Design a protein with these regions (language model features):
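A short glycine-rich, aromatic-capped structural motif
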Residues: 79-144, 160-165, 187, 234-235
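Short, structured beta-strand segments at or near domain termini in extracellular proteins/domains
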Residues: 321-333
């Protein structure tokens, strides 16, 4: 019987099979340039105010940007956790920041959430390969993973090179869903409003993966765990969120429930912000011209400020990036 590692390598070598949510543009090659020959990528540290987009992004749409966010169940959370998950308690917490962040992190406001289960770690190549083998997910983009000699590909490293639709399909395969922005921030901040998962102390390389050139195996930095026992909530890879990215989400009527505006409302807000010249309003990306998806949790090539619990970043859902992966959530009941 083949090991999971062997299965992973075989699947990556085989290339795309059955797409989860394909479109003509999404199934095209991401980049025609051959991968670099160096053993590891150079360290390019990114932080708020710098553009996090990279040339390895897939350019075509592969999602319905108006798709509704998943509802959070209010049922009892006292049952045993699903495998590989830990409970994030329900309740009220402070989301956002009034100072020390970007415009899209304001204002700080109270949000009430139901309890939910969240993966302890980011999804690994090993785990994602099982979904590909079941023909429920398409493989990660092979051209992305081949970059820098394939150093990002090993069974226990977080899977990357997947789009928002790929991430969503994987979580559905597991019986779960993508987390919402408010849920991820709740998992990081806990009840004490901490700046980072481990507290308010600055990041170190013992606690997390940042300011470096590649990912690490999931769970390799236990001193950086969050308040509810989750690993790598800041650093290693960005994680796709269910939500549409809304730069004015915290001023919307649904802010107390962690709900962004509709795509139409978001496009109008983006148009207004661009007209006002507020291109630096949205952290690590310029103000978009389409409805994009939120990503959270920081990445290996980001600086310390980019790992803050309130930092918000966004990309088109079709992008498949070397630094973006997934972590799944599930509502009790």
């Amino acid at each position: 019987m083949r090991t999971r590692a062997a299965l992973l390598l075989a699947l990556l070598a085989a290339g795309p099979i059955a797409a989860c949510h394909p479109s003509a543009s999404e199934s095209s090659a991401v980049s025609s340039a051959p991968p670099p020959r160096e053993a590891a990528p150079p360290v390019t540290v990114v932080g708020p105010g710098r553009d996090a987009r990279t040339p390895e992004a897939d350019g075509g749409p592969d999602e319905d940007a108006s798709a509704p966010t998943s509802a959070v169940s209010l049922t009892d959370a006292s049952a045993a956790p699903p495998p590989g998950m830990r409970l994030v308690p329900g309740g009220e917490f402070t989301m956002g920041a009034d100072a020390g962040g970007q415009g899209d992190e304001r204002p700080a406001h109270r949000v009430t959430l139901a309890p939910f289960w969240l993966d302890v770690t980011e999804v690994t190549h090993e785990a994602y390969a099982e979904c590909v083998a079941a023909r429920a997910c398409r493989p990660p983009d092979p051209k992305i993973l081949a970059r820098f000699g394939g150093v990002f590909v090993s069974p226990r490293r977080p899977v990357t090179g997947i789009s928002w639709a790929d991430a969503r399909a994987y979580c559905a395969f597991r019986g779960g869903r993508l987390p919402r922005e408010a849920e991820l921030e709740r998992a990081v901040r806990g009840d004490d409003g901490r700046r980072f998962p481990w507290g308010n102390e600055p990041p170190t390389h013992e606690r997390t993966v940042f300011q470096t050139s590649k990912t690490d195996e999931v769970g390799a930095h236990p001193s950086g765990r969050g308040p509810y026992g989750h690993d790598d909530l800041a650093g290693n890879v960005w994680e796709w969120m269910e939500d549409l990215y809304d730069p004015l989400a915290y001023t919307r009527p649904g802010a107390s429930r962690g709900e962004p505006g509709t795509c139409e409302e978001i496009l109008e807000a983006q148009r207004r912000l661009r007209a006002e010249g507020k291109q630096g309003f949205t952290g690590s990306n310029p103000i978009p011209t389409e409805c994009e998806r939120s990503i959270r949790a920081g990445a290996y090539n980001y600086d310390a400020d980019g790992l803050r619990s309130t930092n918000r970043v966004h990309h088109p859902g079709s992008f498949r990036l070397l630094m973006t992966g997934v972590r799944c959530a599930r509502s009790p009941g």
